[in-house]
UniProtKB/Swiss-Prot annotation:
Recorded family membership: Belongs to the class-II aminoacyl-tRNA synthetase family. Type-1 seryl-tRNA synthetase subfamily.
Gene3D superfamilies, per database record: Bira Bifunctional Protein, Domain 2 (3.30.930.10), Serine-tRNA synthetase, tRNA binding domain (1.10.287.40)
Reaction catalysis annotation: tRNA(Ser) + L-serine + ATP = L-seryl-tRNA(Ser) + AMP + diphosphate + H(+); tRNA(Sec) + L-serine + ATP = L-seryl-tRNA(Sec) + AMP + diphosphate + H(+)
EC number: 6.1.1.11
GO CC entries: cytoplasm
Residues engaged in binding L-serine: T231, A232, E233, E285, S385
Name of the featured protein: Serine--tRNA ligase
InterPro entries: aa-tRNA-synt_IIb, aa-tRNA-synth_II, aa-tRNA-synth_II/BPL/LPL, Ser-tRNA-ligase_type_1, Ser-tRNA-synth_1_N, SerRS_1_N_sf, SerRS_core, tRNA-bd_arm
PANTHER family, A to Z: SERINE--TRNA LIGASE (PTHR43697:SF1), SERYL-TRNA SYNTHETASE (PTHR43697)
EC class of the enzyme, as a word: ligase
Organism per entry: Ureaplasma urealyticum serovar 10 (strain ATCC 33699 / Western)
Length: 418
């Protein structure tokens, strides 16, 4: 949730920074006005309660002394109670209105994020490995899949519909091997493996920032409070929702492999062939919870962890720093890793590593204490793909294809495929 103290402290600077993230200035004026109203109502409520409590004490004395002012004082207390009821109702409604607005405002970009409008303004940080120069015309992964019977596209459509995949034969074994390889790499790097439900409740999606803004991107279970999770970021971030952690327990590192479900609203006509954009896909996720002063250092190490998998598989990739206009809703800073796909003759996103600062922690109420007597502070949360399995599968198949259409595998995967 957006930190309202930023608006209270300097609404002009806040507007300027958030304009870079495409948030209208009018929204902040609306929030500022509501916040002033809410705080005034709270002050009125506090003053009236103090007056009521004082009069209640006087009533006892007046009654004991049979003072003629007793009835007048009782009437005044009843009047205050009635006024308090009205103020309390108004305050509750206005507080709900304010919270709903705060829930749809994205996180503020960090000052280190390049300013820009869209993906064209993202900044390339580095490239690792040169794309392979084929001495033949390389096939796309969907053609290689058909040639080698790695995917049954027809049965996928028959059983479910478009944007779903059935991997078969060597294709299925490679898919499983990549999942295990990514998990093993993450666990060896110190991440605690979690096996989580793929159905999550509304509170979890609010905590991660997916709701209420991105409801159209989700699959909701009918007549329930449940949704199919769009990413294990939701489950892993919410492991400590409504908890106060010990500072000595931080940082916490988690990794999980889960199927992910997305409606892909608004993506009609994009990446219609192959496995790049599916309604259901698998992803190995990383999540970190840490102290605020450590979060940007943790972002660098998280990104390096995802990069280490691509390097172990010897896949050409590049790291991109997202500009303000391309940042995700919950993110203060994001690096994208893009792997080279010959079929596109371009780099395609395979990982997104983000520092969400205290944005998700405020929504999910994830706090920590330095000592028992110390005040609570919000943790910082980070998340990253390590990696998106279907896109990784496509990258391996395309980059390791041979002239006869066969596919070799990276040395790092040899012990995983049998």
């Amino acid at each position: 949730m957006f930190d309202i103290n930023l608006i209270r402290k300097d609404i002009v600077v806040t507007k300027e920074k958030m304009l870079n993230k495409k948030v209208s200035s009018d929204l902040f004026d609306q929030i500022f006005g509501l916040d002033v109203l809410v705080r005034n109502l709270m002050q009125q409520e506090q003053n009236l309660n103090a007056k009521k409590n004082q009069l209640s004490k006087e009533i006892g004395i007046l009654a004991k002394n049979k003072d003629p002012k007793l009835q007048q004082t009782l009437d005044l207390v009843n009047s205050i109670k009635s006024e308090l009821q009205d103020i309390s109702l108004t305050l509750s409604n206005k507080q709900d209105e304010l919270n709903k607005l705060l829930l749809v405002i994205p996180n503020m970009p960090d000052d280190s994020v390049p300013i820009g409008n869209d993906e064209n303004d993202n900044v390339e940080i580095k490239k690792v490995f040169e794309p392979r120069k084929f001495d033949f015309s390389p096939l796309a992964h969907w053609d290689l899949a058909a040639k080698n019977k790695l995917i049954d596209f027809d049965k996928s459509t028959k059983i479910t519909g478009s944007r779903f995949i059935i991997y078969t034969n060597f294709g299925a074994r490679l898919y499983r091997a990549l999942q295990q390889f990514c998990l093993d790499m993450n666990v060896k790097a110190g991440f605690n493996e979690i096996w989580a439900p793929v159905i999550v409740n509304q509170e979890s999606l609010i905590g991660s920032g997916n709701l209420p803004k991105f409801v159209d991107d989700l699959f909701k279970l009918e007549n329930s409070n449940y949704y199919l999770s769009p990413t294990a970021e939701v489950q892993l971030t919410n492991l400590h929702r409504n908890e106060i952690l010990k500072a000595s327990d931080l940082p916490l590192y988690y990794t999980a492999l889960t199927p992910c479900f997305r409606s892909e609203a608004g993506s009609a006509g994009r990446d219609v062939r192959g496995v790049i954009r599916q309604h259901q896909f698998h992803k190995v996720e990383l999540v970190k919870l840490c102290k605020p002063e450590d979060s940007f250092k943790e972002l660098e190490s998280m990104t390096r962890q995802a990069e280490s998998i691509l390097e172990a598989l010897e896949l050409p990739y590049r790291r991109i720093a997202l500009c303000t206009g391309d940042l995700g809703f919950s993110s203060a800073k994001t690096y994208d890793l893009e792997v080279w796909l010959p079929s596109y003759n371009a780099y395609k996103e395979i990982s997104s590593c983000s520092n969400c600062t205290n944005f998700q922690a405020r929504r999910a109420k994830i706090r920590y204490k330095e000592t028992v007597d110390a005040p609570t502070e919000l943790v910082h949360t980070l998340n990253g793909s390590s990696l998106a399995i279907d896109r990784l599968w496509a990258a391996v198949v395309e980059n390791y294809q041979q002239e006869d259409g066969s596919i070799t595998i990276p040395k790092a995967l040899e012990k995983y495929i049998y």
